[in-house]
Amino acid sequence: MISQSNTNNPISDNSSSRGLIPAPIVRSLRCPACQLHLSQDAHRLHCVNGHSFDRAKQGHVSLRLGGRTPLNADSSAMVVAREALLDTGLYGPIRNRSRELIASHAPSTSAPLVADLAGGTGYYLSGILDALPGSFGICIDLSAYALRRAAKCHPRSAAIGADLRDPLPLSTQSVSVAASFFGPRNIPEMQRVLRDDGILAIVTPTGQHLVELVDALGMLRVHELKDQRLAAKLSNFTPLVRERLTYQVAISRDQARNIASMGPSAHHMTPNQLDARVHQLPPHTDVTVSVNLGIYRQIRASRVVHA
């Protein structure tokens, strides 16, 4: 919650050992109300104009301002389902290949900053940070339930609440890696916060992703023009890597239920409806996991200048 405060007590770089947001991350944050840099004290983030943002007891901080109609943030049940599904390792190959590609193309700089947008529980961010020694990471998400988990996903990370429709609460050219896994994207803002040598990492589902469950469980389909729409939005970026990762795996009914419960399809069915559909599945179902992975760098001439 935003409030007025006259606090002005910045902390030293040993903040992570004291349970606070690591100082290199704080230096990249900016106030969503006035766009000035933020400082940190024992309980909150604040700017010199007196805007103050409390840190939740679980460790995350919301830098979201009011005024917009709220989106459907992930509920507690959705986050529990996602965490249970990810713990099985079903999406492990996506996590592993993504961090390999990112580590191969990330700029060589001291203490690079990684921003995972709509990062959920921090599952993918923690893998990236392990692959980039000395890096720091920010998981940005709208769901407080996801942020509670993301705040503890890695000792060099922080969890920040924000609406991706708004300007990101990050300084211009402060980010070395901007990542998006299955989530919504604000490409102009990602371009603004990226360093000139920074990279954009995007993972999106293909039309074959979980196709065996789409009809059986009434899940949402991937739009047939999804790839073309993304390409149009990335006109100011050049692709460094574009590849498809596809594999098949046998899943249980519980895993199928968690898959349907953890994403946007959960907003379009009741738990009872889902249980009835899952009950019709065999004990194990072979499903296809299929995603497009892309690494991009912005075209220098397209750099947008911001005051």
Q: Which residue stretches match the model-derived regions?
A:
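Conserved Class I S-adenosyl-L-methionine
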Residues: 26-27, 244-307
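A SAM-dependent methyltransferase catalytic signature shared across enzymes that methylate proteins
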Residues: 37-39, 229-244, 264-274
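Class I SAM-dependent methyltransferase SAM/SAH-binding core
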Residues: 113-116, 120-167
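A short glycine-rich, Lys/Arg-flanked "PGG" loop and its adjoining helix->strand segment in the class I
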Residues: 187-201
